[in-house]
């Protein structure tokens, strides 16, 4: 008998990102994610005590992907222009993920001061 496939937290997060890309962040739930992984809902609920906890983890990963995407600028390009164009390009190429980041209410920062102090902003500011 072959060993059971192990479903990791990262696998769940990646599957949830795919659900968000295809259908929108509103459709991230235990059933849609487990269906994407071809498993029961048990592994999803094992790794995340609530669906909200899973959505927050997915949000953090999407935010990280967005930051990496924005920083893909060539050395000869003006950093401010490059970051701005990548911001727009991300919105065009990944509209569902862009909505998740900026319209879902899952943003960690609740004030301008928290946003400025965010570690994700350090490479953006360093490029300028």
Annotated model-derived regions:
Residues 81-104, 110-112:
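Helical hydrophobic small-molecule/effector-binding pocket
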Residues 108-128:
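Amphipathic alpha-helical packing segments from all-alpha helical-bundle domains
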Residues 56-82, 123:
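Amphipathic alpha-helical linker/stalk segments
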Residues 1-7:
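N-terminal intrinsically disordered/low-complexity leader segments
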Residues 11, 15, 19-53, 57:
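Helix-turn-helix
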Residues 19, 69, 90, 127:
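Short alpha-helical functional segments enriched in proximate histidine and acidic residues
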Residues 58-62, 66, 87, 94, ...:
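Hydrophobic/aromatic residues within well-ordered alpha-helical segments
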């Amino acid at each position: 008998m072959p060993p059971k496939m192990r479903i990791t937290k990262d696998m769940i997060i990646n599957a949830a990102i795919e659900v968000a890309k295809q259908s929108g962040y509103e459709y991230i739930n235990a059933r849609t994610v487990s269906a994407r992984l071809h498993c029961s809902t048990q592994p999803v609920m094992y790794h995340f005590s609530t669906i909200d906890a899973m959505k927050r983890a997915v949000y953090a990963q999407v935010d990280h992907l967005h930051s990496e995407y924005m920083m893909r600028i060539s050395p000869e390009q003006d950093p401010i222009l490059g970051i701005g164009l990548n911001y727009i390009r991300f919105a065009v190429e990944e509209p569902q993920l862009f909505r998740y980041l900026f319209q879902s209410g899952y943003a960690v920062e609740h004030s301008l001061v928290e946003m400025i102090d965010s570690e994700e902003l350090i490479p953006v500011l360093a490029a300028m």
